[in-house]
Amino acid sequence: LENLFVSNKLNDFQGKRALVTGAGDGIGEMLAKNLAGAGLSVVVQDIRLEAAERVAQEIGDAATPIAFDVSDREACMIAAETIANDGPMNLLWVNAGVGVGASILKGRPNAIEWAVGVNVLGVVWTTQAFVPLMASATGPRHVGFTASSAALRKAEGSHPLYATSKHATFAFAESLSTELANEGINSTILCPGLLNTKIWDGARARPDRFGGPRFADPALSKQWDEAKSPQLMWPEIVRSIEAGGGYLTCATDNGETRQAFESRAEAIAAHIVQI
């Protein structure tokens, strides 16, 4: 693995176990492969078993695939029972997320429920199910959350439902980070910018209860196909884990994210009044 993936430190995590959700491609695949390259054994989760198996096979003996739906609390709990049989866990990365282009005012109920189910409730159910597996772990413990740079901006533009759900992802992760700290567990809130992932076609694996699979027009993929690789985030993620976590925004837009965040904060601050 050291020949395939970027070498890194994370020495205190070598020989420990990790779980990465949404690891069948994109950011999750990058995380799973690099964690394995750092000497961890990795449980590769995806809602699509074949995707999880592909990534696990490419990693080798250090990886185990598993498939379940993070928006289904019972499925998360059952999966946790299975994974617990192999021992405690030191690192959890709550990465699974879906991209939804619908508006809020006119969005279909199933699209809204799906976005909230994965990007919001999925964060809660995943942490409720798997953080208990960290209780008996020795050595450092860390939970990562993948939010989005969209969580730092006003929730508008071409993907308002997605942006809104990621604001909620960020808020839940922020609250959970305090609860985790009380348990002696560090955490990182990762906010990536636009990257070369398949998030534009997330509905290809949408469960039936949310309307079933839907395949996006490949023409929509252009801006993602031309975007930077998720791999570029890895050195920053390593630094965050080693430093004990915190906020980590990996912007890809030449300063626009910072400007949008600062403008939003200034607009809010300008209208804080004492009564």
Question: Which sequence ranges carry the predicted segments?
Answer:
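The beta1-alpha1 cofactor-binding region of Rossmann-like NAD(H)/NADP(H)-dependent oxidoreductases
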Residues: 49-50, 68-78, 109
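SDR active-site lid
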Residues: 178-248
